[in-house]
Amino acid sequence: MAASVTSVRLRLLRGAALLAIGVAVAGCAGKSNITTGSIARTGKPVGEMNASELRNAADSIGQAYEKNPKDAATGINYANVLRMNGRNEQALAVMQQVAISNPNNREVLAAYGKAQAAAGQLEQALNTILRAQTPDRPDWRLKSAEGAILDQLGRSAEARQRYREALDIQPNESSILSNLGMSYVLARDLKTAETYLRSAASQPGADSSVRQNLALAVGLQGRFQEAETIARQELTAGQAEANVAYLRSMLTQQNAWKKLAADDSGNTN
């Protein structure tokens, strides 16, 4: 039965890592020049909002979008919040309209590509990201996003090359190191993944999503208590509970907690 345990672990790792990388791709626009990653009315970062606040933010920005659907900044912010609410198809529809109105805007093309990736349109997303990139002024965010998409397409060697190119432009950037670590999660090399993710989490400006990815890599190795401790770090009680819920939701796919615990204790019969 060892082969079936390996198969279960492979499916689990791929499903969990793709979700985490998808979050990284979706969040990448939060550091761009066109969007601040926070809602102007409250000044609160999107990543720190609870579910109710995210719904309210979607309603508020949605009203601004309806008034001026051609505005790039409003459209990108709206799509970001929609993705945080799990409304990927609607986010993609928003970015399609914004891209029609701003066909040469590099930030819009980047956000459009990320929306396509979040909606599962990976080949289209890759093409859009490549259109947004300029060889004479390469953007590390686009390099990292391209790598994340390539990882989801199963092209890990190319993906890691893009991450390293991004690191050449922006050394020690936490989001790039995090995506590189998740690439090794996909390859089931959890020790290497943990090394990169710990480095990512130690960088100035590392956000909650980076710690979530580290917690995932630790949890997938069976160190569940340590994973929860990482997920709770430097957050308010509400944010910590949200992070732990996120971690558990990923690790409970296909009864992951039980399967991995049994596997780690040597129960392969």
Regions found by a protein language model. Give the residues of each.
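Structural marker of alpha-solenoid helical repeat scaffolds
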Residues: 67, 100-102, 132-136, 169, ...
